[in-house]
């Protein structure tokens, strides 16, 4: 189970020390760095990039990848009758960086254990894409992007997790696709809900009864 890392520790120096075969003591100052992945028996959570680098002024895509263990699941932005959605907040990035919201692939309809309750969830690996654009006048050689990720992973019980994740990318003049991550980003985009359509929802309320309908100019499915 992952809990918030005390950010005050960012300012502390660690020490790696050893004594060599001649009895001489050696010490190295060590500063803490955040990893890009967190895991336990129920889930693996990772911050990844679609590209191997970043170009000032151009939009790249990061992704928060969640891979629950068998029989476990995470939640959509509206979890349903139980559960809480994944989030990525408290970003640290160069001043002027534009960071978009998490995008949400379409979830599964998940009944809750012999009850009338229903959840909207992901029972397998899911990637939440995030658009990131650093300022066009950025002059550094590398960029570190860090976020506080929160998730809720459930089987018959739910385990909340929270971990600061970080990724560092070199600055370049042209973007280069990370072939190892290309498929998971492509799959995530295929599963995103279609936003450009003319479907209208119609809701009617009569007492305790609610009716929901949809209207479109042509057959949709």
Language-model features, listed with the residues they occupy:
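Extracellular/lumen-exposed scaffold segments
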Residues: 1-221
């Amino acid at each position: 189970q992952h809990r918030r890392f005390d950010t005050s520790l960012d300012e502390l120096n660690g020490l790696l020390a050893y004594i060599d075969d001649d009895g001489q003591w050696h010490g190295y100052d060590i500063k803490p760095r955040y990893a890009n992945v967190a895991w336990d028996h129920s889930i693996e959570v990772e911050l990844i990039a679609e590209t191997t680098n970043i170009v000032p002024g151009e939009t790249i895509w990061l992704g928060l990848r969640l891979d629950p263990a068998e029989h476990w699941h995470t939640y959509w932005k509206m979890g349903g009758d139980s559960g809480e959605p994944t989030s990525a907040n408290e970003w640290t990035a160069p001043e002027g960086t534009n960071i978009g919201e998490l995008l949400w692939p379409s979830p599964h309809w998940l009944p809750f254990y012999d009850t009338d309750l229903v959840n909207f969830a992901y029972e397998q690996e899911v990637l939440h894409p995030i658009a990131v654009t650093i300022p066009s006048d950025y002059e550094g050689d590398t960029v570190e992007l860090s976020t506080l990720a929160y998730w809720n992973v459930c089987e018959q019980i739910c385990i909340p997790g929270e971990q600061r994740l970080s990724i560092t990318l070199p600055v370049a003049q042209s973007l280069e696709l990370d072939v190892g991550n290309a498929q998971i980003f492509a799959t995530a985009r295929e599963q995103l809900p279609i936003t450009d359509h003319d479907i209208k929802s119609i809701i009617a309320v009569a007492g305790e009864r609610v009716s929901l309908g949809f209207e479109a100019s042509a057959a949709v499915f």
